[in-house]
Amino acid sequence: MLLVDPALPMAPFAVALSGEFDCRYRAEPEEADRVVALVTASVPVGAREVAPFPGVRAVLTCSTGTDHLDLAELSRRGIAVASTPTYCSDEVADHALACVLAGWRGLWTLGADVRAGGWEPETVLRRFDAQRLGIIGLGRIGMRLARRARALGIDVVACDPVIAAGTEDIARVSLDELLSTSDAVSLHAPGTPGVPPLLGEAEIARMKRGAVLVNLARASLVDLDAVVAALDAGALSGAAFDVWTDEPPAADDPRLRTRGLLLTPHVGWSSPEADQAWRDEAIDGLRVALTTQPPSSAQPRRSADYAV
């Protein structure tokens, strides 16, 4: 039996695994011994979640990240872990570039000003090929973003302790240099529970004045209050987020009214192509996880490791 997170559609699993597994959203207590795999999207899975199912051999998360899984505990129990790390790399890179370009051209602040009755722009608009983009995390997504940006004549630098220097001739710089010299900073690093934000108040303060910050990765990577303070002070010209501390955010969250802040509803991954790709990748990953001996597990990667 395969237990699927109710937040996920059942059809991809029921159709692809018909005849192999009984796919359910829940199991009766007397059926617990039949469960061999758990499928989640963002629901945490650790000792408490797998304890009722002694026959579980694999956990699949339909996501690029695994920070909601207790990888150490699952490995200790001999439970294989699979994820869907590549299905939306192009979509997230596209979304990040769109945010960077919109920030440099002031699109969301100008639109708000016009709707409020304004017409004379107060925002400094920027020419793309005169800007520098700093990418934190040069894995699959970061590399795709770099290629797209360079095609527009944008100077690209990166900070990533995992990816070797010289990759595609993209300059590696320290985090301090990236923050202080980049006209936009885009984050593409994994989150790590219990670790301080990669960009805290001190790091935000070191960013180039008037820069744009883009975070499509994990809300925990950035001190949101420090970003809001920097926007209010004019230190940053814009910030775009596709992730938030609580999703969806409370309607009365005062940070949502911050000028220069763009928040999209965690849709950076989305496209018809990605919607099909995650299904294919999930089924393939689950089959591998269930048949690999000894079990293969995703390796935990700290936010300090960057590459995703």
Which role fits each region the language model picked out?
Residues 27, 62-63, 79-90, 160, ...:
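Short beta->alpha connector loops at strand-helix junctions that form conserved
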Residues 1-37, 305-308:
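N-terminal glycine-/charge-rich "phosphate-binding" loop or analogous flexible N-terminal tail
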Residues 6, 138-139:
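Glycine-rich Rossmann-fold phosphate-binding loop(s) that bind the pyrophosphate
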Residues 210, 216-308:
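Rossmann-like dinucleotide-binding domain for NAD(H)/NADP(H)
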Residues 85-132, 144-147:
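Phosphate-binding beta-alpha-beta segment of Rossmann-like dinucleotide-binding domains, i.e.
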Residues 2-3, 133-135:
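Hydrophobic Val/Ile/Leu positions in short beta-strands of Rossmann-like dinucleotide-binding domains
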